[in-house]
Each structure stands twice: as C-alpha cells, then as structure tokens.
C-alpha cells in the first residue's frame, strides 16, 4: 500500500522515517510468497493465541493509515494480556475504585468508549495499558477495578476476558459481551488539585 501511495521504496521509507523514526529503517517491501516474507496468521495464533493476534492488529496503528508489521511487537501485546490476567492473583481489599486510581478509571472508561466509536482502537488500547501500569504501581487491583479493565478489554481480547470474567466469580451464563458497558462520571474525569501556599517567614522582609 505504501509503495503504491508514494511511488517508490525510497519515498515510502522517508515517509515512515518521519512518522515512526527508527522503526522505518527496516526495508519496505511488498509481502510476497516468492520473497518468503508473507506472515502466516495461523502461526502467530498458534504461538501467541487469537486474542494476542487480534489485539496487535488493532494496536499497530490507525485503521486509515498503513503501518509496518513488527512480529517482535506481538510479544509485547502478549505480555500485556499476561499482566492483565496476573492481576486476578493480585486482588487487593477494597470496594469500588480506590482514591489513588479513581480518576484514571473514569478517564479510561470515557476514552476507550469514545475511541471505539471513532475506530481509534490503538489509542484505546494504549489507554488500557496506562491504566494497568497504574494498577501495578498501586499494588494490584480491587475486584471492581479489575472487572472494569476486563470489560473495557473485552472487544479487543474476547476469549481471555470471558475466562477472566468467570474467574472473578461471574456465572458461565453471564456472558461478558452482553454485560452493560461501564459508566463514567464526568466530574471524576478531572484531576483534583489542591494548591498549598507556603510562606517561609525567614525570607519575608517587612
């Protein structure tokens, strides 16, 4: 697609250089059986699973723009799914969303929902990765926090999230795909800041 759009390999590589930096330094060639560079999706699924393949395809870039295929990046998506699953073994006590992650939870619900509607799947997934990192930074997740993560991740990794939904105590008949989408509160999407004025009396000259 890039070769057709830019007319030459040199022009296509320059375009990717501007957009992706070092990623674009790999030679750009068409996928062809004769060149032996065709990616077999079945092999990727066999190695990493269908959810990882699905997640990577939606994370690799905007649907309306071409992006280089990076097999190495698939492993990164697989590690992300592993981290989400591992949160089920790191549940912490507490009801609902904890104060330290509440704002990010509501921001993520809002952004993922909006991005799905506009087909910006890559930025929705990036937001989920940010949230998962924050949960790890805060020692894990409450059940409510992880349930929300699982719901938001379901469109991108349906098989794993359905299993994880059951692991969190939901019945097999309570299919996650038909469960109500999480709701956010606009007021809680805004970072709360407190300004504290500190006066050092020794520096005040009267």
Spell out what each predicted region is.
Residues 1-4, 9, 173-180:
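Short, positively charged
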């Amino acid at each position: 697609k890039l070769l057709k759009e830019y007319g030459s390999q040199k022009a296509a590589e320059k375009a990717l250089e501007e957009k992706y930096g070092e990623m674009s330094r790999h030679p750009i060639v068409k996928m062809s059986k004769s060149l032996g560079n065709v990616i077999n999706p079945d092999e990727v699924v066999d190695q990493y699973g269908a959810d990882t393949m699905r997640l990577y395809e939606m994370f690799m870039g905007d649907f309306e723009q071409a992006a280089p295929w990076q097999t190495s990046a698939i492993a990164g998506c697989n590690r992300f799914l592993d981290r989400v699953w591992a949160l089920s073994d790191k549940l912490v006590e507490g009801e609902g969303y904890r104060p330290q992650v509440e704002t990010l939870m509501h921001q993520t619900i809002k952004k993922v929902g909006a991005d799905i509607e506009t087909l910006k799947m890559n930025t929705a997934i990036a937001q989920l990765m940010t949230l998962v990192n924050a949960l790890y930074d805060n020692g894990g997740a409450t059940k409510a926090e992880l349930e929300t993560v699982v719901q938001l991740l379901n469109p991108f990794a349906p098989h794993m999230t359905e299993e994880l939904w059951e692991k969190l105590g939901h019945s097999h008949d309570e299919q996650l795909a038909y469960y109500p989408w999480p709701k956010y509160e606009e007021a809680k999407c805004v970072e709360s800041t407190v300004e504290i004025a500190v006066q050092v009396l020794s520096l005040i000259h009267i």
